[in-house]
Amino acid sequence: MAEGDFKNDSTGCIGDSVEFTTFKKRTGKSLGNRRKKRGLSGWEPYFQEPELTAEEKLENETLYSRNIPLTVRMERFIQRYRSRRKWSDPTRIRLFTMYLDLGGVSTGQKQFTGGTDINNDAKAREVSAQTTTDYIEYDILDEYDIDFKWVAGVFLSSHILYNAGLTKEEDLQIACQIVRNFLLSVLHNNVAPEFEDNIRDACLLAEQAETELISNKRLSTKLPGRLQRALASIHVDNYKGLWDKSQSDRTSDSSVNFIESNNTKFMPNDELFEPDGISRFSTQQARDYIQRTLGPRYLTGKVVEQEYLTVKLVSKTLLNFSNQSLCKAVFIVWDPPGSKYSQDTNKERLEVILESDLLNNTVDGTHLEGSFTFLDNGLTILDTVLAVLPTFYEEVKDE
């Protein structure tokens, strides 16, 4: 897998391709048959491939000899790997293809002529091996370094968040498991022994990613938290008085939207339009909550600046407030590796007061993209959170 190869626009067959049906067929039970007998798909969370037989080890030594270029070895391995997994889930297929593409592997269809055409009597697994090929540009190593960990890190951070658009926890888990499953199989079959340490590091990163991405997903639904929402309702123009209008005023408003279904008109759930003092604050609710939690000092202040920033969490310190368990979260302004532009700001360090339970499962080094409002009394308000990003977040450098 090559560092920096964000998109492979090749449409033809570049590099060597191998039809695995040309190898001598094993007389013993194949790995695929043994897996089928065990009733496994190959995608179980803690799946382990069966120990290789002596015959399989010998075949692997032939297929993946270090005398063969790594690009050819990886092409051969990917072909066999695809045939030994069940691909009934379209999300898994899409993510695996995106992962390969990021690493410089282009997926396409073989062209057949003469005696190499598909044997219609072949088993489905053999037909798949004949028809689907993953290609790696033959000269890719002239321009890029091999770095399995880099590819895993970029794929499981910026790529799945902004290119794949994953939002469900289940899909985030699938993405991490795909990378880990694939790399463990590379190790198991001794495809790239010269990169063993790098591949093991990539496997560990995939495990770390699964924990962080799920934690970050849950945190993103809770931020900016009750206190910051209350502060925004007092100080930030976009939120001031947003929930002050009473329900009776809303129903009499000529612009109110009704939902029509089966010729019956009705109002959306009234609770959605009422301030609850938790995620939606009227001005009075916000003032009361801030007074109880922080004291009167934080009710005043003038906005001096507002910026959208990407920041990195560097520390969390518990604060001594009697009515609420709070912490001071310290962030530094941070530009992701590989980002196109540096942030145009004179800010370097931010301090935000948050409920301590929000960050219980958040590790230092986690990144946020959000809108910050700065007051003349030194208070910083995190009024909008756009994304919570993992510690290993990285983007792809422009070519």
Swiss-Prot record:
Pfam families: Arb1 (PF09692). Signal peptide: none annotated. It comes from the Eukaryota. GO terms for molecular function: endoribonuclease inhibitor activity; ribonuclease inhibitor activity. It is found in: Nucleus; Cytoplasm. GO terms for biological process: siRNA-mediated pericentric heterochromatin formation. Disulfide bonds: none annotated. The keyword Nucleus applies. Component of the argonaute siRNA chaperone (ARC) complex which is required for histone H3K9 methylation, heterochromatin assembly and siRNA generation. The ARC complex contains mostly double-stranded siRNA. Inhibits the release of the siRNA passenger strand from ago1 together with arb2. Inhibits the slicer activity of ago1. Required for swi6 localization to the centromeric repeats. Component of the argonaute siRNA chaperone (ARC) complex composed of ago1, arb1 and arb2. Interacts with ago1. This is Argonaute-binding protein 1. It comes from Schizosaccharomyces pombe (strain 972 / ATCC 24843).
